[in-house]
Amino acid sequence: MRVVMLGYQTWGHRTLQALLDSDHEVVLVVTHPKSEHAYEKIWDDNVAELAEKHDVPVLLRNRPDDDELLAAVADARPDIIVANNWRTWLPPELFDLPPHGTLNIHDSLLPSYAGFSPIIWALLNGEERVGVTAHRMNTELDAGDVLVQRSVPVGPTDTATDLFHRTVDLIAPIVRESLDLIASGRDAGQWVAQDRARASFFHKRSAEDGRIDWSWPAERLERLVRAQSDPYPNAYAFHRGQRLRIVSAAVSQGCYGGTPGRIFIREGDGVVVVAGAESWSGRSRGLLVRRVRTDDGTEYAATDWFRTMGGYLTSRP
């Protein structure tokens, strides 16, 4: 089949590479210009460079709705459009243009976690599995019928970085399987409508989303630290007015009472910070902070940074 690919960052790069390695012909690539957004500067393998290396025409767009782009896609005569990590809405005159429409590759187990940063949100919410879905694009974002879906388990110490690597490796086989089904006509009867009653949709992550709220239970704070693992912007709080990024943490073994954010006691290789809206009861676990990092990039063992107990980690300076 003749394929037009729309994609960005490593997700789009993996998709394009899978298409180039297949029996299908990539006739045009559309990708976004480079961005200074923190979450778009990581996992930033360049789609345009890969396309140009293989002599595939490339168009750069923030939004794919101008007449020049629509004409270029029509002139390419695609049988299908394949999209992955396209960051803006696609109009129907584009996604319905090819005979087989548009196949979107999304890194969640749809209908859950449509939208942005699905792996981070899923980890934060304690999901047991994450994955990748190939679905038909329609007028509602990430809501079309599903053709192929694959998942991987979330381990108790997995970080968002671990899960990124595990799920990005699912892209190529999912792209190959989906296109082979469509090209051969074996996709008939295989498309499954999403259960919209189970759907959830999430916004882009920003610096505010990494700010620690010490009224959260320690279990959720520990997942936040893992969800904001390097190279993502780390979860952070403030100590004596200075921002402190929490690089490594766990849930404390003991239960500790007091005011959320109190730097309380050493436990094992870390320092326990009181956490949870019910911490006044003395029955809540604390967040065992193991490693911290200052804004200049210097990393410390928590036991070295917090030389004495007492004082507070706060949400604001």
Put a short name on every predicted segment.
Residues 1-42:
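N-terminal Rossmann-like dinucleotide-binding module
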Residues 7, 29, 51, 81, ...:
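A residue-level signal for conserved active-site and pocket-lining positions in enzyme catalytic cores
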Residues 8-11, 62-65, 86-88, 229, ...:
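Short beta->alpha connector loops
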Residues 13, 41-44, 66-70, 88, ...:
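Structural motif corresponding to alpha-helix initiation and N-cap regions
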Residues 22, 80-201:
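Donor/substrate-binding cores of folate-linked one-carbon enzymes
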Residues 203-216:
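Acyl-group handling in specialized metabolite and lipid biosynthesis
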Residues 213-317:
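An anion-binding loop in the catalytic cleft
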